[in-house]
């Protein structure tokens, strides 16, 4: 290469570097001004998870392995987990058959003596971990069918078996009402108890940007979602502006050096603890809208980063519904602790770790890491699970400190922070889960609240009175004064034979 040509090539390279540097510097100034504006993603469009994958390949891949991704899907060989090869289920006088039609579609046929068979075409699936539910479509309305598939045990079961209600009177005649727009009939009677309309119920928590689209005058629905399932924009907010503006590589590189977060998207890890918890609480804490009609007509206005309390309030034991303060009582123990799942957010709100500390959902759970079953952060399971607490309670990090604090072997279940402070007393999706009301275990308080206590969930051959005596011996009578509430008391073995269904499940 001649000297003159090398000079020109070198000059062009220098100019390119200088030009890029000037462009980045200019973009940094623009970003600096951009960062000063308040984030407001209301009115911003959605682009879908595939658009996010173009830049965020690793995050897309980790999300793809979660059960959030498959929360709702169109029925297809990729999404349907149930046995539709002609499997049958008989319950409450109804015979259900699950098979495929001539076109390969999925269907359920329900037959009851004295009534014609009813055929429901399965068009969508809900869930993919413990059990999978199925939706049929009738015009503009989707209905949850009365039969579900247990993924882990590979069997069909009636939806009445997934909820805690009294069994129907076996001698009562089956009710076979005519189908109406507000209530279809599949098997009829109690078999259909948990048939539910998806458009103004399940849609809110299992999809991105749900909008029931209810017409107030006709009661019909024009339901829409930005994406089926719980995808990127459910947690990060609508991404149209973010995707458009960050298509410019100069802006992307300039953002790396920016002192604050990109205002065109939400990073939950950069939100204040309460706002971060609000994001999860939108679905993991059942709530009621301040004004129900706008929610049904236009959708939930919440976007990640919002204060969840601006448009809705969490349900509590005494939350009234049409003046009835007992409407939600069965979802909680007597003392207001959640009895059923989907109230984890309420548990956090009752926890001193959140009320007086920095605890939030992502302190323990990682949406892009860990086992999809629970999505615990790496390093917070098994023998190292106590780290979820000792990052604040550092004095209890060493085994000797754990043994002194718990009076248990630190390597055994009694040395686990969660065993005592988050006992498994919550029922849902066919399993018993940890309470998210993080508190000091107190047998007397648990007994007065009508719920199982942490001690006897492990010491199943002991009574609550024994647990109270042990607590006073270990930690002092000042903290645990004697209580007449637990005099005598019962054991979990006796609870198995009792009438409280969640207590039976906990004891089992």
Regions found by a protein language model. Name each.
Residues 1-5:
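Short, Lys/Arg-rich N-terminal segment immediately upstream of the first membrane anchor
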Residues 10-22:
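Hydrophobic membrane-insertion alpha-helices, especially the h-region
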Residues 20-32:
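Membrane-interface motif at the C-terminal end of an N-terminal transmembrane signal
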Residues 29, 33-36, 50, 58-127, ...:
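Primarily the internal scaffold of c-type cytochrome electron-transfer domains
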Residues 42-57:
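Local sequence-structure signature of Cys/Sec-based thiol-disulfide redox active-site neighborhoods
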Residues 171, 187, 201-205:
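Long, basic N-terminal domains or extensions that often function
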Residues 176-182:
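Surface-exposed intrinsically disordered loops and tails
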Residues 199-213:
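Conserved catalytic alpha/beta cores of large enzymes that bind or transform nucleotide phosphates
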């Amino acid at each position: 290469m001649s000297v003159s040509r090398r000079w020109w090539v070198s000059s062009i390279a220098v100019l390119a570097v200088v030009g890029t540097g000037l462009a980045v510097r200019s973009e940094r100034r623009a970003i600096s001004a951009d960062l000063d504006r308040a984030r407001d993603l209301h009115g911003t469009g959605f682009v879908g998870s595939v658009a996010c994958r173009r830049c965020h390949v690793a995050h897309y891949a980790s999300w793809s392995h979660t059960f959030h991704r498959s929360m709702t899907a169109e029925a297809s060989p990729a999404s349907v987990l149930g046995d539709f090869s002609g499997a049958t289920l008989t319950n409450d006088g109804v015979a259900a058959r699950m098979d495929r039609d001539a076109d390969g579609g999925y269907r359920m046929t329900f037959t009851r003596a004295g009534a014609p068979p009813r055929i429901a075409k399965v068009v969508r699936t809900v869930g993919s971990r413990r059990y999978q539910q199925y939706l049929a479509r009738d015009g503009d309305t989707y209905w949850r069918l009365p039969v579900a598939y247990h993924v882990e045990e590979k069997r069909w079961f009636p939806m009445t078996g997934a909820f805690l209600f009294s069994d129907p009177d076996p001698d009562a005649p089956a009710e076979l009402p005519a189908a109406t727009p507000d209530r279809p009939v599949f098997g009829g009677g109690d078999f259909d108890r948990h048939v539910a309309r998806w458009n103004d119920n399940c849609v809110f928590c299992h999809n991105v940007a749900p909008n029931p689209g209810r017409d107030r005058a006709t009661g019909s629905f024009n339901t829409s979602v930005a994406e089926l399932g719980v995808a990127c924009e459910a947690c990060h907010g609508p991404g149209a502006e973010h995707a458009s503006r960050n298509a410019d590589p100069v802006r992307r590189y300039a953002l790396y050096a920016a002192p604050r977060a990109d205002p065109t998207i939400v990073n939950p890890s950069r939100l204040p603890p309460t706002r971060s918890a609000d994001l999860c609480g939108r679905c993991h804490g059942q709530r009621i809208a301040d004004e129900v009609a706008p929610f049904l007509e236009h959708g939930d206005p919440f976007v990640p980063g919002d204060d969840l309390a601006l448009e809705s309030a969490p349900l509590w034991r005494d939350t009234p519904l049409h003046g009835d303060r007992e409407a939600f009582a069965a979802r909680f123990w007597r003392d207001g602790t959640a009895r059923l799942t989907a109230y984890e957010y309420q548990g956090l709100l009752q926890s001193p770790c959140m009320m007086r500390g920095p605890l939030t959902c992502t302190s323990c759970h990682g949406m892009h890491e860990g086992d999809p079953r629970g999505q615990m952060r790496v390093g917070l399971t098994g023998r190292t699970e106590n780290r979820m607490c000792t990052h604040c309670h550092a004095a209890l990090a060493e085994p000797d400190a754990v043994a002194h604090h718990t009076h248990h072997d630190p390597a055994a279940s009694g040395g686990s922070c969660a065993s005592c402070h988050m006992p498994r007393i919550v029922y849902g999706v066919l399993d018993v889960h940890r309470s998210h009301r993080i508190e000091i275990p107190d047998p007397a308080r648990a007994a007065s609240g009508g719920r199982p206590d942490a001690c006897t969930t492990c010491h199943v051959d002991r009574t609550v009175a024994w647990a109270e005596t042990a607590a006073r011996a270990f930690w002092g009578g000042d903290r645990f004064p004697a209580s007449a509430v637990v005099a005598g008391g019962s054991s979990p073995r006796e609870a198995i034979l009792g009438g409280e269904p969640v207590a039976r499940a906990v004891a089992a």
